A protein has these predicted regions:
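A solvent-exposed, acidic/Ser-Thr-rich amphipathic alpha-helical stretch
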Residues: 2-75
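A beta-strand edge to alpha-helix "cap/lid" segment located at domain peripheries
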Residues: 64-130
């Protein structure tokens, strides 16, 4: 199963990058295998970048269905994540767009596109922040 997980960066002209293979991205996974490997390392404490654990809370709002048919749903929403690590509280916010495959017994994420609207990022971002 393919998945596309993309969080572009902002370029010098305040435009989002569009080509994750040739431009800087904040996070990019072109396959489900890469994303599953990252999640596995986080969940099994094999990620030195995630030690010590980050405590976080994510809220979503303004959920909107953009398109829907028998096997697919496209939706968008706003998110805010509060993250606490190294005695520092960070807040991340932005917009997500999902393409869900609804043809099977449970929905599967086929694409996740994240626009992070923070101007400054003080720590390394990871998939659990967005």
């Amino acid at each position: 199963d393919d998945v596309d997980y993309f969080m572009p960066s902002w370029d010098d002209d305040d435009k989002l990058t569009t080509d994750p293979k040739n431009e800087v991205s904040l996070i990019y996974y072109p396959s489900r295998a890469g994303l599953e490997d990252r999640v596995f390392r986080i969940e099994t404490e094999r990620s030195s970048a995630s030690t010590p654990d980050t405590r976080y809370n994510r809220s979503i709002s303004n959920i909107e269905i953009l398109a829907q048919d028998e096997s697919r749903v496209d939706l968008t929403f706003q998110f805010t994540t509060h993250s606490f690590r190294y005695e520092i509280l960070d807040t991340y916010f932005g917009t997500c767009r999902y393409e869900l495959d609804t043809s099977g017994p449970k929905p599967l994420i086929k694409k996740k596109y994240i626009v992070l609207k923070n101007d400054y990022i003080h720590h390394m971002l990871d998939v659990y922040h967005v």
